[in-house]
Amino acid sequence: MSDIHEHKILILDFGSQYTQLIARRIREIGVYCELWAWDVTEAQIREFAPNGIILAGGPESVTAENSPRAPEYVFTAGVPVLGICYGMQTMSEQLGGKVIQGVGEGEFGYAQIEMLTDSLLFKGIEDAVNSEGKPLLDVWMSHGDKVSAIPEGFVAVAKTDTCPFAAMANEEKQFFGVQFHPEVTHTRQGMRMLSHFALDICGCAANWKPSSIIEDAIERLKKQIGDDEVILGLSGGVDSSVVAMLLHRAIGKKLTCVFVDNGLLRLNEAEQVMEMFGDHFGLNIIHVDAENRFLDAMKGEADPEAKRKIIGRVFVEIFDEESKKCANAKWLAQGTIYPDVIESAGSATGKAHVIKSHHNVGGLPDHMELGLVEPLRELFKDEVRKIGLELGLPYNMLYRHPFPGPGLGVRVLGEVKKEYCDLLRRADAIFIEELHKADLYNKVSQAFTVFLPVRSVGVMGDGRKYDWVVSLRAVETVDFMTAHWAHLPYDFLGRVSNRIINEVDGISRVVYDISGKPPATIEWE
């Protein structure tokens, strides 16, 4: 079996919103990489032993006092280095070049760079050719400052009308700098550039692929767990489902899954989870029907934050009770993924590889005294999904829209009652079913229904009725940090509204939420 961690790239984070995207792109190319804060020590870099280093972008100005710098060792480690945006500027400054503060001359958005000379990084890449026969590339810029003089040993590789050094290179030392962002899709040939860097320049082999990751994970799980038993909180979400499948392959019946039905799930979700994991895949599952316990605990509580805490607390209590029944369990499995690890790391002393475990199940009690098993902690969400497919989980389950941890507890506004949850479940199922029918489900990033604790007058037949209101919500987004409301066709919305009002007794009015994020959040609570 090839070692999937043998070849690796280190990415130093200077605070750019795109840094995780760089890591995901390198992984897509088939090379393992890790993301660390910029102030990593020489000893830590030596221990990691990367085949190449990427200096990512960042919001600071290199010209400002105390702005972040790459460790000096980066440039003496004897491995290729790629500086992106701020990364190029700090590379230039640290190696004897010059950076000037942008005064109204920054480049933001689409730009076309003109290639001035050949470089390994840009080998065979062009989007167009200008009248002088020089290759042109379509790229995405986002910078105010710019390099005004490059360090000794470097050459200018590309320019724009306002930026004389859009790319620079020292081919001998294999140091490269680009002022644009190759990791974003708007840079059309960005993946090819990153591929040149990781595979050709750094000499990495493309060993990082789903089948190899699964093989490696199973091997490591067997080694870590031995003959012990493991307990896992299975929610039916992507992460816990993939963890369950990996562990099932690694240790079989020594895995016990605890599935807690809190009464806040989607229509028929509990039955689907039990059918798929219990009947179809043959996992050992304890099914806890705790609907009344959760609803009783939330009785009279309307505050969203308080509801979240109650749901988290009750889950932990139940999980604790059930785990005591598994007296032989020595390990607790969790669906911690790489972005959780990065969030926990921070800067200065918290490099992503030395952080404390990230408890993603709402703080399990310390007295459980179980070892932690986190087979997904190196993976991004898109990688987890690809692994899930390889393990035989259905596509529509792995790629369905996000569902909040507290479930309908934060989609029923105000106090949560069984009646409200039942109405909301049915209305939401109609909305999702119609999105699939109209081939719109995968065209929006997230769609759901919200229950409003408001009664509204309606007319049914000859009589009037005074029933509840629901709101439909659908958004389009790339990263869920910002989002546009989805412009769904009027006739589609009309069809959904008609079906809900006619088929769900107790709902008299349907509205559509046309708020963007910001100022609104995607979820209502």
Curated annotation (Swiss-Prot):
<dbReference type="InterPro" id="IPR004739">
    <property type="entry name" value="GMP_synth_GATase"/>
</dbReference>
<feature type="domain" description="GMPS ATP-PPase">
    <location>
        <begin position="208"/>
        <end position="400"/>
    </location>
</feature>
<keyword id="KW-0436">Ligase</keyword>
<dbReference type="InterPro" id="IPR025777">
    <property type="entry name" value="GMPS_ATP_PPase_dom"/>
</dbReference>
<dbReference type="GO" id="GO:0005524">
    <property type="term" value="F:ATP binding"/>
</dbReference>
<keyword id="KW-0315">Glutamine amidotransferase</keyword>
<keyword id="KW-0067">ATP-binding</keyword>
<keyword id="KW-0332">GMP biosynthesis</keyword>
<dbReference type="Pfam" id="PF02540">
    <property type="entry name" value="NAD_synthase"/>
</dbReference>
<feature type="active site">
    <location>
        <position position="181"/>
    </location>
</feature>
<dbReference type="InterPro" id="IPR022955">
    <property type="entry name" value="GMP_synthase"/>
</dbReference>
<protein>
    <recommendedName>
        <fullName>GMP synthase [glutamine-hydrolyzing]</fullName>
        <ecNumber>6.3.5.2</ecNumber>
    </recommendedName>
</protein>
<comment type="subunit">
    <text>Homodimer.</text>
</comment>
<feature type="active site">
    <location>
        <position position="183"/>
    </location>
</feature>
<dbReference type="InterPro" id="IPR001674">
    <property type="entry name" value="GMP_synth_C"/>
</dbReference>
<dbReference type="GO" id="GO:0003921">
    <property type="term" value="F:GMP synthase activity"/>
</dbReference>
<dbReference type="Pfam" id="PF00958">
    <property type="entry name" value="GMP_synt_C"/>
</dbReference>
<comment type="pathway">
    <text>Purine metabolism; GMP biosynthesis; GMP from XMP (L-Gln route): step 1/1.</text>
</comment>
<comment type="function">
    <text>Catalyzes the synthesis of GMP from XMP.</text>
</comment>
<keyword id="KW-0547">Nucleotide-binding</keyword>
<feature type="domain" description="Glutamine amidotransferase type-1">
    <location>
        <begin position="8"/>
        <end position="207"/>
    </location>
</feature>
<feature type="active site" description="Nucleophile">
    <location>
        <position position="85"/>
    </location>
</feature>
<dbReference type="InterPro" id="IPR022310">
    <property type="entry name" value="NAD/GMP_synthase"/>
</dbReference>
<dbReference type="Pfam" id="PF00117">
    <property type="entry name" value="GATase"/>
</dbReference>
<dbReference type="InterPro" id="IPR014729">
    <property type="entry name" value="Rossmann-like_a/b/a_fold"/>
</dbReference>
<feature type="binding site">
    <location>
        <begin position="235"/>
        <end position="241"/>
    </location>
    <ligand>
        <name>ATP</name>
    </ligand>
</feature>
<dbReference type="GO" id="GO:0005829">
    <property type="term" value="C:cytosol"/>
</dbReference>
<dbReference type="InterPro" id="IPR029062">
    <property type="entry name" value="Class_I_gatase-like"/>
</dbReference>
<dbReference type="InterPro" id="IPR017926">
    <property type="entry name" value="GATASE"/>
</dbReference>
<keyword id="KW-0658">Purine biosynthesis</keyword>
